[in-house]
């Protein structure tokens, strides 16, 4: 295992980038380039998706968050300002999806609105009548996955 450790253990993000992706590519018949790699997560996993993909856009070309948002950040400056240059971001990320339930107030819709105002291309899905729950995330998954096979 090739990761940096502190007294809390290995960085989850380093494990994904340095260990999991190479293991998957070595073990399974995958396309190993960024053009064929996406990451998605639900709830805290949605936030982890941002924290994994955005600093490593050389490894991913699509991302999805299901009830995952970043709290208390300026979207123009977070992740070294990756969203500030919408043209560059949109060229690098082929598909971005953010979904949530209509009955949850988790910040997803607010963040999506801010990204739209910056010119970031993304699809937003609001699951009708659902909360921060599995039905929301199953619906988000159903909306997200078909887009991964369009480019």
Predicted regions, residues:
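Non-catalytic cap/lid and distal C-terminal segments of serine-dependent acyl enzymes
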Residues: 1-151
């Amino acid at each position: 295992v090739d990761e940096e450790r502190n007294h809390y253990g290995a960085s989850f993000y380093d494990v994904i980038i340095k260990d999991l992706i190479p293991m998957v590519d070595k073990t399974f018949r995958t396309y190993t380039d960024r053009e064929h790699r996406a990451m998605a997560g639900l709830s805290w996993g949605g936030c982890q998706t941002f924290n994994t993909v955005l600093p490593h856009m050389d490894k991913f070309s699509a991302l999805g968050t299901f009830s995952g948002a970043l709290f208390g950040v300026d979207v123009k400056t977070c992740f070294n300002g990756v969203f500030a240059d919408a043209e560059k971001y949109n060229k690098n990320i082929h598909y971005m999806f953010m979904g949530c339930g209509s009955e949850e107030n988790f910040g997803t819709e607010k963040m999506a609105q801010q990204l739209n105002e910056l010119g970031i291309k993304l699809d937003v899905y609001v699951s009708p009548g659902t909360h921060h729950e599995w039905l929301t995330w199953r619906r988000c998954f159903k909306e997200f996955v078909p887009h991964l096979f369009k480019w």
